[in-house]
Amino acid sequence: MTSLSNSLSADTGTTSFSPAAGGEVSDFFALLKPRVMVLVIFTALVGMVVSDATVNPVIAAISLLMIAVGAGASGCLNMWWDADIDALMTRTAKRPIPDGRIRPDEALAFGIVLSVGSVLILGLASNWLAAGLLAFTIVFYAVIYSMWLKRATAQNIVIGGAAGALPPVVGQAAVTGHVGIESLVLFAIIFIWTPPHFWALALVKSGEYARAGIPMMPNVAGPDSTRRQIIWYSLVLAPLALLPVWLGFGGWLYAVVGVLGGLGMLAGAVQVYRLREGEPERKAAMGLFAFSILYLFLLFSALLAEQGLGLFRAVAA
């Protein structure tokens, strides 16, 4: 890895960032990728509520906090490692390290302390299975994905997506002490959802990824191949997302959201495949990117309403 205090050159010019004397609290918080932390808390919570167990609210709250901190720690380590390429991309150039607000060594120390602390506290407050799964998630994202896969293969998002899919598994383990079929199904849904979600964005940002040297699918296999793969993943996702209904922990509300959302994903994927030039292409890709977020949110919200709030009953119960 090149020194983060050196100037970074790109084909279009030179970007540099200097070591900061110390960042503000808000800068350190930004290192944690707070938007990702919110999603992690949400999916981990759903992993907890679908479990057939009595949940201790105090342990659940501490566990959610530690899972979120662990996710933030891995995000911090990711930003530390990726600061050189972040400086080359418009959407990431203003992150705390490339913008010079936080020194790389500060970010590294911050990420390590939070990683170790979150795992230890989760183990002591809940159980060591959950702590081990959290540790694996952190290492997988910060080391295997960030330091290896991201810059090595166009399948980076596919394989690396496992890290983003693990929070429901960690959540279930935290409140039950084991990993059940419910959280594994949620893992599979997020895992298959991830490629079409990120590849839609990659179609629009392919130039920036190429400039930063990241082998995203549109730059390696080409836009047309990427569009076809988005359709294939969406075709797999639609029936996969209905598994909770057949397994008895998804009710009629979830079924309706799953069917309509799955059809929406397929329709968006077809639009991305059809519209291949200019502004219509960009709108179709960004439309699918935005809809995929809404789809996953509504899907998991339906489970939360049914299982967590007890508003509905599972159709297969």
From Swiss-Prot:
Its EC number is 2.5.1.141. Pathway: Porphyrin-containing compound metabolism; heme O biosynthesis; heme O from protoheme: step 1/1. The chain crosses the membrane at residues 36-56, 57-77, 108-128, 129-149, 157-177, 184-204, 230-247, 251-273, 284-304. GO terms for cellular component: plasma membrane. InterPro entries: Protohaem_IX_farnesylTrfase, UbiA_prenyltransferase, UbiA_prenylTrfase_CS, UbiA_sf. It holds the Pfam family UbiA. Keywords: Cell inner membrane, Cell membrane, Heme biosynthesis, Membrane, Transferase, Transmembrane, Transmembrane helix. It is a multi-pass membrane protein. Its main location: membrane. It is found in: Cell inner membrane. The keyword Cell inner membrane applies. It catalyses: heme b + (2E,6E)-farnesyl diphosphate + H2O = Fe(II)-heme o + diphosphate. PROSITE patterns: UBIA. One of its GO terms (biological process) is heme O biosynthetic process. GO terms for molecular function: protoheme IX farnesyltransferase activity. CDD domains: PT_UbiA_Cox10 (cd13957). It is an enzyme of class 2 (transferase). Carbon 2 of the heme B porphyrin ring is defined according to the Fischer nomenclature. NCBIfam families: cyoE_ctaB (TIGR01473), PRK04375.1-2 (NF003349). Converts heme B (protoheme IX) to heme O by substitution of the vinyl group on carbon 2 of heme B porphyrin ring with a hydroxyethyl farnesyl side group. Belongs to the UbiA prenyltransferase family. Protoheme IX farnesyltransferase subfamily. This is Protoheme IX farnesyltransferase. The gene is ctaB.
